[in-house]
């Protein structure tokens, strides 16, 4: 019997999210790799949930980070209420989109935690 790849497919340019230990990685879908049930994404931001409210705290701008190919099953659709505040933070006129060493390390740690 042949295993069928996952049927999870996201639309190109759609914003998706991976949730892990109260941290959220938001990314833009570049393409679906259906043969291996993976998703090619462009990281946008890393955020953390606030236990006292439903709001997310913006942590790192990841727009200049390396693109990722990860299992599609890790992702979920990002909610408008999550994305809109982050987008306004990312594209604020006074904000530079420089990938800092701390942001790069945070992304690396987040991805490493997924595979532990």
Model features per residue range: what roles?
Residues 3-21:
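Short coil-to-beta transition motif at edge beta-strands of beta-rich domains
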Residues 23-34:
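Short beta-strand-centered aromatic/proline hotspots
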Residues 22, 45:
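A broadly conserved detector of short glycine/acidic/proline-rich loop/turn motifs that flank catalytic sites
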Residues 47-116:
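Intrinsically disordered, low-complexity, charged/polar segments
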Residues 36-44:
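Short, solvent-exposed secondary-structure boundary/capping segments
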Residues 1-4, 77:
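Membrane-targeting and insertion segments and their boundary/processing signals
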């Amino acid at each position: 019997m042949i295993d069928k790849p996952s049927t999870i497919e996201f639309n190109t340019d759609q914003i998706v999210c991976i949730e892990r230990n109260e941290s959220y990685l938001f990314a833009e879908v570049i393409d679906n790799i259906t043969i291996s049930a993976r998703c090619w994404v462009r990281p946008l931001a890393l955020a953390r949930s606030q236990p006292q409210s439903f709001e997310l705290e913006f942590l790192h701008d990841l727009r200049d980070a390396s693109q990722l190919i990860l299992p599609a099953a890790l992702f979920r659709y990002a909610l408008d209420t999550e994305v809109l505040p982050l987008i306004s933070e990312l594209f604020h006129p006074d904000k530079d989109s420089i990938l800092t060493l701390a942001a790069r390390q945070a992304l690396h740690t987040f991805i490493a935690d997924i595979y532990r």
